């Protein structure tokens, strides 16, 4: 058959909608990871499957693998441990605090772009090495869990005592479309910087395709002082302080080596660009054998210690024990060796017992002694190796578990008993939960409290909508909305919030005197449900709003103010809160927040319509409140938005505020934001708005709003799943 008669032209990649309209709103990020791409089926429960796993047997198999060197990819120093530590580190190390995305929690290293990042050269081989073990234990252990467990076993096999391991990471089955890795279109480019050295939010790596920093120094400039600046910024953006940063770098570089045996130009394309016969592997090298002593990954050729497969203090011993001078690897990369020929014969060769080498360091290693603050920490850990081991163990555990959410999600026999502040602890339920009659009595108290529908709904939404599905932080459980920093966030209307909380705390105190107890976290959510119930009744519809007690109240001591500060919304389209003009549009920020709330496009749409008519704007303005009867749960927002009797015009230079006027008389009718108008402008969102604007849609609208509301209220109720 000739090519022009082929019935499958789409396989060649035709022009897409985004090719025609690059600024088209990305709603596809709201519909990822569905049952359509997941082979496991809706009835598969990974937590239950993991509980049936013989973890000790898996670890024993991994331990045997560590020294079972394969001809197709020989182990450095006869031990795969350092390679597997790098695999686990680079899986977890993509996490960033800004939006909670990245990290080890989904097994995303198997997919583009991470599987093909320049910083992940040869990790395709690491995953193939553990495939027989994944194959053996099947669905009882996810790739995400196995990758981190392998890193732990690697450390243990080389004499290090880890803090523990928790399972519970659920695999995804397609690349993540929601994560913004940067605007660059070339590997290792750094358009993400502006000004002096201001890194774009929420990014936490210095260049496209790197996990953290350039090991040669900023943009390849071998300046340890400048490297320290980058290290401090990037590690802080993944929740590590200076002490943890030093311990992680020194601990990780106690093991193994880097690979730069020859010219990096001889390395072939990454896995996503490699030929089909390579079967998902990439970076095929034509330099000599391309493996073992001929391997090329970063282009650096560094072995830090004389004990590369054994935990020791030798990294610090060498770092402080020599004066260093700049040199280049065989691949031409900047690295450092001892001055005046010192250190000859100290370092073993990774594949030839007859060869010896000098110690070598990266520019980023030297930053640990050039930067004054890092130097103090490095010297202390050098002089106190037991403290070094303890800090590294805790930092490694944090690194590999930071994106798993609360400890209640942790699975397995190796979960540490200690709970850490970075895990956002919440006390366990210590009292009988309220029953149906108690809930009825409390509802009557709330109704009679004088609080408005808008006030209680706004407060419940503010409490629950901090949740991020990316790292499972935030949410209504813990009632942290009453604590710093959340109580002072402008988006939460601190004055109104204080008023509502005072009333609810009074109701709670009175109820708890009866011998039964309800947490403020539960009461805040219940009050929101009462508000919706009243609003539906105002609209002539009797409804039952699901409410499940079981939340508890965290204390200020259990709340890291700095850590929680990153959860503050810079914008919240659900509350029409847009205090700052960004290069990203308000509607894009809305979709991003909806994705973090794990909402679909229909759920996002119905929530916007409901929250608007319930009058919940953060500034108490009437922007987007497209109804003459606020606090009535009606579909008025959609009806009036799609009314062809209204025309819209911008009222601000930035075109982020609009006025709707009568098409005939020109009389003002409404005001709206970009977030409001996008539901009439975007074709996909308009299609959804039309469903809810139809004359027969009122009951559907209320039912769908209640379902989406309940979902948000329970996002952090992992005990209900």
Curated annotation (Swiss-Prot):
One of its GO terms (biological process) is cellular response to hydrogen peroxide. Its cofactor is heme b. There is a cross-link at residues 89-212 (Tryptophyl-tyrosyl-methioninium (Trp-Tyr) (with M-238)). The keyword Iron applies. Pfam families: peroxidase. One of its GO terms (cellular component) is cytosol. GO terms for molecular function: catalase activity; heme binding; metal ion binding. Formation of the three residue Trp-Tyr-Met cross-link is important for the catalase, but not the peroxidase activity of the enzyme. There is a cross-link at residues 212-238 (Tryptophyl-tyrosyl-methioninium (Tyr-Met) (with W-89)). The record marks 86 as: Transition state stabilizer. Homodimer or homotetramer. Belongs to the peroxidase family. Peroxidase/catalase subfamily. This is Catalase-peroxidase. It comes from Shewanella baltica (strain OS155 / ATCC BAA-1091).
